Amino acid sequence: MKFKFSIIIFIVFFHQSIIFANHKVYVIHGFAGFPLQMEKIVQGLNHSGYLTENYTYPSFSEDLDSVGRDLYRKVKYENFDTVSFVTHSMGGLVVRSMYQYMKPTGHFPFIYRVVMLAPPNKGTELADFQFNHVSKTFFGPNVENMKTNYDSYVNRLPFPTCEVGVIAGIRGKKPWFNPFLKEDNDGTVTIGSAIMGTEKDVAIINSMHILMPEKEKAIKLIIAFMKTGCFVKNKNLK
């Protein structure tokens, strides 16, 4: 029995060693975000032994389709054996946009895992409001891309085919917090909009949207999912 257990441990360790021998994690900020906002996540992953890149892109001026294409080209060019992604907000849509350019027969690194923080996977009602009432020139092309209607850009994007973990934020559905969002939300994205329905695991934490990348609980959940493919047993962390 002990011999079999030792064999299992060896196989698991050997498998993980192969994955992490040439494995890179791309950390991607959201709309109007910046690399410094994601630095605590980068540091947490680095301390856990992961090779990372704090990836940035022009979220105001370049549309999601172009950003996804640029990410695809970069990942393909760098040619790591295995890659993973940790994203905040619209960064999750950047990864989904990247999937449009991945061909089944084309050479591309194996995508191991993706962790999305507060992703507007089904759009956000704030985009509906802002697109209708504020100049597109001010916000750029991606506000329209994140509208909630069924045929909007975000709702036509492919879902990742790898293991995905979604971390959603909650601050309650009090009218004074955000009158435009009727469901439980983080001030920008509702829980229902964050969840795709295809992810492997979901965790909910008490956090405002913009502050989630700096939350210690979020970082611990990210590392847990990257290591094991799941979050902690108690997934509702206040």
Predicted regions mapped to residue ranges:
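Short, solvent-exposed loop/turn segments at secondary-structure junctions
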Residues: 32-33, 92, 121-122, 170-173, ...
